[in-house]
Amino acid sequence: MAQQLDNAENKKASSNTSKTDLHTLTKRQDFILASRGLKHSCETMIVQINKNDLGTIRVGFTCSKKVGNAVVRNRAKRRLRAIAREALPNFGRLGFDYVLIGRYGSTVSTEFKTLKNDFISALETLHLKSKGEA
């Protein structure tokens, strides 16, 4: 039994440095810093990125009251979280903060596949821009 716990702890420790381990932005200051970085707007969402010195991928989600009532905002954020979980391990880069902002109507009503494609194309565009600035 103790050996199983040790193995579980080792797996957990090794996954902390993985690219699939997404850290969530929670502090207002982190969101403000991300807003000063590069932005890409599309019909379904706004994506903001900014470099961080941590060497990890951090992601934040926000939806204003313009998106709808609490139920609609939470549904939009759930969809954005699902997209980030699927796309960032493959298309995100270590050392960047990402903020996904939901848009009125379209974040909730658009097909999931379309949302994901919009997010991936936004990431590719923003990473090309970030290379040009460096």
Give names to the regions the model predicted.
Residues 1-134:
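Positively charged, solvent-exposed patches that mediate nucleic-acid binding
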